[in-house]
């Protein structure tokens, strides 16, 4: 089952539930929430690090969520793993950028705090 939604800025997004064997997989609404959390924080972190003149070869965020057992099922625990790649990375600046994102700038993070315990890890 699939649904198309149009965001306020006019972008079309297809969401739904994929069954085993589906050739046209779609993201579930809950999976999109985790993706939104990662992108929100990632945008902050990259912007802050650019202002700090930190050069990265690559940057990735993995998010993992644990759902409650009872309905309505929602994420009650989320692990965010920040992975930074490059030579001579300034770990203090990276820690500061991640901290600013998770404590000050990322609005999606603030929304998640209302219902989930969020843990973060930084990997170099």
Where are these regions (language model features)?
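Extended beta-strand/beta-hairpin segments
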Residues: 1-35, 46-124
């Amino acid at each position: 089952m699939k649904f198309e939604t149009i965001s306020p800025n006019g972008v079309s997004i297809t969401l739904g539930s994929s069954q085993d064997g589906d050739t046209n997989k779609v993201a579930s609404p809950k999976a999109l929430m985790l993706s939104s959390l990662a992108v929100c924080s990632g945008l902050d972190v990259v912007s802050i690090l650019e202002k700090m003149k930190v050069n990265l070869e690559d940057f990735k965020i993995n998010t993992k969520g644990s759902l409650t057992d009872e309905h309505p099922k929602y994420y009650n625990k989320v692990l965010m793993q920040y992975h930074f790649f490059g030579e001579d990375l300034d770990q203090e600046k990276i820690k500061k950028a991640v901290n600013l994102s998770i404590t000050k700038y990322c609005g999606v993070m603030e929304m998640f705090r209302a219902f989930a315990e969020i843990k973060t890890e930084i990997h170099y």
